[in-house]
Amino acid sequence: NIPGCNRLAYFGTSSFDAGVVAARLLSDRIAPEADILVGSIIHRGDGGSNQCRCREMGFRDYLGRAGFRGRLLGASLRLDDEGYNRRVLDELFEENPRIAGAVTFNSTCYILANYLRSSGHDGVRLVGYDVIRRNREMLEAGVVTALVAQRPAAQGFHGVMALCDMLVSGRRGPSDNLMPIDIVFRENVRFYNSHII
């Protein structure tokens, strides 16, 4: 949801609140003084998306209100450079042995999950976003603790329907249409079908 873009309609989650949900999921599973790794996995360029920034704001806001006393440790990782990522993360974990949680704010938490699994950091709780195939595999394997999901097929369906209503009948519906924030665990992922509208 990008303010000021003259959109017909937005169908999706509140990114800020999705960040709050991730913080709650993670902070309920680690000690208040434990450190959290914030993995920024760069797809292109050097900045994250508006959605990722809003998720991180919600995450930080919740931790600030919840009595979190640990540190948030950032790591900028690369989408297609496993060697670089390993060097960055090895150094970060060596210098910060109190890391007990990790989060990514885009759909590529499997990159961080691969590192955690291969480097023996089994105790780190990882929360990510979106039930894409590789994230789902890591969730089913128990490497990812939880995924925050947003029903992309339903978003697309409702968006196309809003466009059809506008083009066919001239009706313009509400511009902001917030959808549920789904929490997916290893135990319920087999029931999660994002294509059900």
Predicted feature residues:
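Short beta-strand elements in bilobed, periplasmic/extracellular small-molecule ligand-binding domains
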Residues: 37-38, 60-82
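Hydrophobic alpha-helical segments within soluble ligand-binding/sensing domains
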Residues: 11-36, 85, 151-168
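Flexible loop/hinge segments that line or gate small-molecule binding clefts
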Residues: 1-17, 132-140
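Hinge/cleft segment of the Venus flytrap/periplasmic-binding protein
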Residues: 46-47, 63, 151-197
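Short hydrophobic segments within beta-strands
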Residues: 38-41, 103, 184
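Short beta-strand segments enriched in small/hydrophobic residues
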Residues: 8-9, 35-47
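Hydrophobic alpha-helical
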Residues: 74-134
